[in-house]
């Protein structure tokens, strides 16, 4: 288990190659990260995005940091340098909890083995752990798909928001993994995909993934979601998550809250598909989740086309929080969690 290659990422043993999601679907470009700062920049600049994918990417960034400082002879100095690596990576995206989960897991492996292992052995152990995180993610997503597809009926049409597919994970996907599993199980499933302004992950990534998979997909603008629900075209909504609080409040891509409100109004089940690593058991509710605000030019421009002049005020939160009362169920690899979330989430930890 020395390498991994998926649609999202490839670990070569000395570098991490990421598909550059900023250019999809028009161009398939790749970024090769040769050190941990390359990885940090790729996460920050959204070369890679999606909480599980960010977590795995950060783990490999930690390994690249270990390789970079493996020339040191002092293990304490080596550990201190990796603390700097961890801090650099952790500052990239504040909302996606998988980032911190993966870095803490890597740091624990380092600390557990530091007293008894030499530096070269530590590097090997860290690389094995990062690969384990990546391979585990794929299996977890497949189990999420298996658990979630039972909620879909043959002939259902699902609305999605943003991208929680293979591109948002190491492979297979969470929300799209549920759809993928249902199709693999012989169900006829169609999808309506919100374009997801301002970064257009739904239009650029979700539609690209689903079309490549042969799943019938219709693209709509975000402000069409309520109308297609009212027309009776939607049987279920499935989204991913970047962080889930202990009470079941869900932070996900901006616009998710609006979709959840609309789903509630129209009596449509609203499902969240996410691994247990996305649940932040230390955060009591959504009020404690930090919401990243991104560069205003993501709204001022649509790709390279200017939409408004520089004197226009812009507000660009990357995420919103959907309160637990709007969430029908949370689909995890262990089980489908239903209300009361305050009780049922804690039981899993």
Curated annotation (Swiss-Prot):
Sequence positions that bind substrate: 49-51, 93, 201, 252-253
Keyword DNA-binding included in the entry's annotation: no
The protein's annotated pathway: Amino-acid biosynthesis; L-methionine biosynthesis via salvage pathway; L-methionine from S-methyl-5-thio-alpha-D-ribose 1-phosphate: step 1/6
Keyword annotations: Amino-acid biosynthesis, Isomerase, Methionine biosynthesis
Transmembrane segments: none
Active site: 242 (proton donor)
A Pfam cross-reference name: IF-2B
Site (Transition state stabilizer): 162
Record-linked SUPFAM superfamilies: NagB/RpiA/CoA transferase-like
Record keyword rRNA-binding present: no
Catalysed reaction, written as an equation: 5-(methylsulfanyl)-alpha-D-ribose 1-phosphate = 5-(methylsulfanyl)-D-ribulose 1-phosphate
Coiled-coil annotated spans: none
EC number per UniProt: 5.3.1.23
Listed InterPro entries: IF-2B-related (IPR000649), IF-M1Pi (IPR005251), IF_2B-like_C (IPR042529), Initiation_fac_2B_a/b/d (IPR011559), M1Pi_N (IPR027363), NagB/RpiA_transferase-like (IPR037171)
EC supergroup of this enzyme: isomerase
Domain of life: Bacteria
Xref: HAMAP family: Salvage_MtnA
Family to which this protein belongs: Belongs to the EIF-2B alpha/beta/delta subunits family. MtnA subfamily.
Protein name per the record: Methylthioribose-1-phosphate isomerase
């Amino acid at each position: 288990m020395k390498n991994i290659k998926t649609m999202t990422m490839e670990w070569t043993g000395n570098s991490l190659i990421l598909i550059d999601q900023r250019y999809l679907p028009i161009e398939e470009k790749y970024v090769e990260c040769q050190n941990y700062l390359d990885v940090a920049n790729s996460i920050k600049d959204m070369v890679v995005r999606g909480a599980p994918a960010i977590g795995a990417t950060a783990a490999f960034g930690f390994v690249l940091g270990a390789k970079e400082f493996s020339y040191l002879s002092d293990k304490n100095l080596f550990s201190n340098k990796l603390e700097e690596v961890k801090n650099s990576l952790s500052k990239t995206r504040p909302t996606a909890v998988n980032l911190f989960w993966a870095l803490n897991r890597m740091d624990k492996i380092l600390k557990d083995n530091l007293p008894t292992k030499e530096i070269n052995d530590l590097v090997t152990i860290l690389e094995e752990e990062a690969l384990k995180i990546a391979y585990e993610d794929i299996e977890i997503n497949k189990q999420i798909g298996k658990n979630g597809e039972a909620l879909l009926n043959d002939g259902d049409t699902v609305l999605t928001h943003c991208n929680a597919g293979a591109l948002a994970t190491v492979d297979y996907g969470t929300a799209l993994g549920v759809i993928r599993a249902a199709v693999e199980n012989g169900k006829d499933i169609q999808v309506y995909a919100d374009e997801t302004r301002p970064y257009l992950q739904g239009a650029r990534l979700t539609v690209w993934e689903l079309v490549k998979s042969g799943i019938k997909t219709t693209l709509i603008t975000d402000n069409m979601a309520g109308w297609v629900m009212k027309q009776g075209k939607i049987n279920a909504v499935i989204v991913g998550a970047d962080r889930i609080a202990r009470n079941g409040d869900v932070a996900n891509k901006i616009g998710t809250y609006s979709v959840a409100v609309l789903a509630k109004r129209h009596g449509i089940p609203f499902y969240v598909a996410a691994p247990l690593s996305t649940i932040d058991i230390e955060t009591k509710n959504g009020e404690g989740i930090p919401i990243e605000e991104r560069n205003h030019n993501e709204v001022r421009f649509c790709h390279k086309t200017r939409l408004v002049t520089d004197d226009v005020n812009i507000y660009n939160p990357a995420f919103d929080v959907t309160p637990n009362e709007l969430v029908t169920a949370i689909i995890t690899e262990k089980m489908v969690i239903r209300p009361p979330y305050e009780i049922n989430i804690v039981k899993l930890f």
